[in-house]
């Protein structure tokens, strides 16, 4: 209550912030006549002068802001015919300050972004503008590119399928447009390259994310993964799938739709054991079977075709639950995707092994400065602040919003609801008012389409199956008599322009067929109407059988429905019901926030390790004298081997050290095999003599050879480490049953695995170097196979050229090849 009176007297925090920008706004507006006086040729010269002043330290970037913003506004009016409104200037200042600008749909976010983009481009470090799809990246780069060009700035655009040279050129531009996936995957690929001239990115200075809620929140649960093939067989997936089809619900397993899990009963376990001919599926040796069974159950009873995925060209393709877009190339992890392929009887692809991965949360936190813009962010302000340190600023609209948002209408059954929806569409269609029907799944959009076809109502369907003309369909959705059915993808970023007589008819009507789990997604749908002061209306149609109502509606809501009394086909329109639904949505949002926060806690452990490894990789790649790193590794490795000798000196210990020296360092090349144990200094001298021989053979190629082996061993060990961390992550949740904190255990055990990784890299480097054979070649520089298909060798022009040959090896921490299941160093490696 007290805070309410404080806001009444002093205004909200947002109001106070907006008021504080008035002096800057006045400065920009006062410069309008000065900028108008400049000729077209003087504009780029003026911007170049600002850049020089900044780089010479004569003025700061904040001091330049009013003049740069005024110059951009004038140039935009001349080139694009669009002049920035004051609210867009406010948004631009907020973006420059590293905030999220919430601006209503249709208020001109794309144009607003040009202000901070140009200002920060003066630093010469590259500004990245991140969009949700290739179409918007290409459109915005071409559209705003004309403005940037008039100012003397260059623009690059990233789209899928570009070559490395084209990508490098795009990143070299002052401003680079691209999707979040392209930026993230380029970062991962750069950290798999072998030569500095292969890198495409040039740092992470400033990024502005369009539809920031979609990228930083909706996609936060899906990490970017580059993977390589695995040798594991896929037959188990089809075998288990056949068994699952014969299990009976309730008797053999139970389904928790709310938690999205399926629990196998004792009877179900017996059925599986009989079918597979095993005694106990819960025996530790059958852990893989347990995993396959649970994933198959999930595939059959939690994941729905045309809702969570579609089947296209003999493949299971994921449908993004928030945008309704297809996600080709993405795969569910932990064998779930293979279980879905077995369920749909398409080709089951082999499980892939992770070679590199990062979450969007950790990728975008690498930028020195991050900003975002969207029409709907305020409902997630807490998450933006806690995870990204980003403050949400609500920018007032240029014109008052006059859209009418009607109360929800609720029916008993889905059938009654859909009948009412079709009836409402027919009535609106008769009077010519355009309707945009929003659905949360492909399944629902196709059901309504089928019902409308039976009534001979002409309409367009826009979902993941029919998305080729997305922008065109959405742009036409505001014309007289148009009926458009769209999933959540709904052409975000594309303006719906109202036809000439549509304003008199009441504008575009938004008809929601179901409430989404997130209020923000519902608000996005509503925001398609009533843009820039246009008229419009919206209404959601619900039923007690909708997933949100069924799974998350409270008992209080059910009781309220009974008291209100519902006849068949009769809807209820009640503010208390709408509030109860909103309360259910808040609970789900809170649940999803905790999931994302938990994922980030785990990924932060991996992120620290990734940062260390990628920094090490960068240092190796750019070190003109990589022998310094070799010497450091040698000292560390010899210290590890000889450390126990400092406290004890006995035959068994001597024998163990002797074995390690000959096994890892291959000392038989430079000294006779006997029981004499060299001192640490003698061992170091002997090993360095092997490097001297290598140097004399490799000649000018020596440093390149050192770098290559160091990088290849690092990549090989990192790949194995990622697999080990995946295994640790999968099983760590069980620690909770032992009254231990799974996150703390993951951190501790992850650190132990990381220490082993560093030891493995050191050992692998010396196993390789001490077993290298260089064969002199006429035409080819020392050739090597990349660790994966995503690495491409750089061109070299050198006279002395060699072929590198390596022998197969077993690392001390690898599983012993004898099949015991122990590590090599604890098994055959002891001897």
Curated annotation (Swiss-Prot):
Q: Report keywords, A-Z.
A: ATP-binding, Cell membrane, Cytoplasm, Membrane, Metal-binding, Nucleotide-binding, Protein transport, Translocase, Translocation, Transport, Zinc
- State how the cofactor is bound: May bind 1 zinc ion per subunit.
Q: Which reaction does it catalyse?
A: ATP + H2O + cellular proteinSide 1 = ADP + phosphate + cellular proteinSide 2
Ligand binding (ATP): 88, 106-110, 495
Cofactors needed by this protein, per the record, are: Zn(2+)
Summarize where Zn(2+) binds, as residue positions.
816, 818, 827-828
Q: Name one GO molecular function term.
A: metal ion binding
Its GO biological process terms?
intracellular protein transmembrane transport; protein import; protein targeting; protein transport by the Sec complex
Q: What is its EC number?
A: 7.4.2.8
Q: Which GO terms describe its cellular component?
A: cell envelope Sec protein transport complex; cytosol; plasma membrane
Q: Does the keyword Zinc apply?
A: yes
Pfam families (alphabetical) = P-loop_SecA, SEC-C, SecA_DEAD, SecA_PP_bind, SecA_SW
Q: How does it sit in the membrane?
A: Peripheral membrane protein
Chief subcellular location equals membrane
InterPro entries in UniProt: Helicase_ATP-bd, Helicase_C-like, P-loop_NTPase, SEC_C_motif, SecA, SecA_CS, SecA_DEAD, SecA_motor_DEAD
**To which protein family does this belong?**
Belongs to the SecA family.
Function (record text): Part of the Sec protein translocase complex. Interacts with the SecYEG preprotein conducting channel. Has a central role in coupling the hydrolysis of ATP to the transfer of proteins into and across the cell membrane, serving as an ATP-driven molecular motor driving the stepwise translocation of polypeptide chains across the membrane.
Quaternary structure, per UniProt, is: Monomer and homodimer. Part of the essential Sec protein translocation apparatus which comprises SecA, SecYEG and auxiliary proteins SecDF-YajC and YidC.
What PANTHER family does the annotation carry? CHLOROPLAST PROTEIN-TRANSPORTING ATPASE, SECA INNER MEMBRANE COMPONENT OF SEC PROTEIN SECRETION SYSTEM
Protein's UniProt name? Protein translocase subunit SecA
The organism's lineage is: Bacteria, Pseudomonadati, Thermodesulfobacteriota, Desulfovibrionia, Desulfovibrionales
